[in-house]
Amino acid sequence: MGKGGMNLIDASSWIEFLRGRGSEPSQRVKALLARGQAGWCEFTLVELWNGAQGQVEKKALEELESEVRLYSVNEQVWTKARLLARRSREKGITATSGDIVVAACAANYALNVEHCDSHFDKILPIAAKL
């Protein structure tokens, strides 16, 4: 969707990073943070806070909130999310509401999506055409 630059990071990759896993998604998040190219939306923050485990993870989230760019889930994003949900279902694709909102947000702001969730491989091409 985006052409280089900023990335909207999905909760799937944030969780890998926050839990200190040495996975590829965790390393990609680390690199995006170092380059100042990490972003998230309110929906992702809710998901992360809802699943935060222990004080170390909560402290890391608090610190990240002051340095990671927040992309608002505004009226345009919600409109794209509804359209993306409808078009995805028409193609027989089922994705979580959270993934739909993140993909719509990325489409709205022309951002890349960092993820480790197979739903995105199916819905991002649809979102790119919104």
Where would I find each of the regions flagged by the language model?
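A generic structural signal for short hydrophobic patches within well-formed alpha-helices
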Residues: W14-I15, L45-L48, F120-D121
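Short active-site oxyanion
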Residues: R35-Q37, E67-R69, A107-N112
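Conserved glycosyltransferase catalytic-site signature
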Residues: A11, E42, E75, S97-I100
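Acidic, PIN/NYN-like endoribonuclease modules and their adjacent C-terminal/linker elements
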Residues: M1-M6, A103-L130
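Short, well-structured N-terminal submotif of metal-dependent ribonuclease cores
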Residues: M1-W40, N50-E63
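Acidic catalytic patch
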Residues: E47, V68-E90
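A general structural signal for well-ordered alpha-helical segments in protein cores
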Residues: S26, L45, K58-L61, W78-A81, ...
